[in-house]
Amino acid sequence: EKAVQNYFRPFDKHEAFIMDERSFEKGRRPMVTSIFLSKGCVAKCTFCQRGAKGYSVYDLSKLETYIKDLKDNYNVGFLVVADENFGSNKKYTYQAVELMHKYDMLWAATGIRVSSVTKEDLLFYKNNGCTSLKFGIESGSQTMLDVMEKKFQVEDIKKALFACHDIGLNSPPLGFMLGMPGESLKTAKESGKLMGEIAAHLKIPTGLIFKHNDLLYTIPLIGTPVYEYGKQLGLIGQSTDEEEKFLEITSNVGAFKRYYINFNGAPMSEVVFWDMLVFLEATRSYEKLMKNKTENKELKQKYINQNNVQALNPHVKAKQNKIRKIEVMGAVTEINVPISQYFVTNFVKEN
């Protein structure tokens, strides 16, 4: 029984729910757990390692039994829908959403395409218990979206996010990715511009722009087109042993700059500057658009509360062993020792 409780935690320790006032209503069951409504994804993004082929949905009758059990026996009142691709099957999604609402669940979805929703969908979701939707956008550059084969436009991103914000649905920190083949100073600036536009639309207070965005560097995952591209360039190993070593090293690292493999072709002095350029351009774009607007002080307090919650979550700040600092083109970066040795040996070759 004690082990089972590890799968649940109080809602006020989860950032997906504390931004919504409905979470604090009297009588609501306090525990949160994750569920799946579907498996797989309809997209074929070139950087994404697919956990399952195809796309399938969970049986609705079994889903209802499961939700009822969670409520009655585990005091659950909040659900995190952990699908890769929430909402692609519209008819099924509406039925599943109605089921969650039937059992008085507040819920959030952590993986949704901007092309999978309309404003009418968002209103339906909110009215049936949705508190938060996390979109996978990856870039503000149409060039890079096309390289990633995201199959949507930058305007689709704005349309979905602005609709969420306008009807009061929270959208957690957006994920931006740098370093795919074709990335450049120009495309990095385009991502920064979009980041600033979104922040200005929300009237996010100065200093919180970057807390609303995750900015990561591409890691080539085995089985993806970008991994095969890296192999063709000779960056992932010339032999089976070298490839095995690469996989061993990268199997448990995050998508951060310190682990980036430069299959882009840009000079490393430019590569290490991309993330800073994104933030600089985001600030410039934000300040320009906010000239005649007032910061949203209520939203500021909500983000402060959210940050306090994230600080309590042991998964947010994963500890790394054997950290040291090395200098890469003038940028001091904290790097795991085996990764740093591999990085310096194989990729920092620029004169």
Q: Which role fits each region the language model picked out?
A:
Residues E1, R113, P267-S269:
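Helix N-terminus capping/helix-initiation residues
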Residues R9-G182, K193:
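Radical SAM [4Fe-4S] cluster-binding motif and immediate context
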Residues N127-S132, L194-L215:
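Structural recognition of alpha->loop->beta junctions
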Residues A43, K91, T143, V147-M148, ...:
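Flexible glycine/acidic-rich beta-alpha junction loops that bind and position SAM and/or redox cofactors
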Residues E1-F8, I219, G223:
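Glycine-rich beta-alpha loop elements in corrinoid/cobalamin-binding modules
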Residues D20-E21, G27, P225-N351:
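Radical SAM enzyme core and accessory elements
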Residues V76, K102, K150, L194-H201, ...:
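Short, well-ordered loop/turn and helix-capping segments at boundaries between secondary-structure elements
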Residues A188-S191:
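Short alpha-helix in the alpha/beta-hydrolase fold that links the catalytic acid
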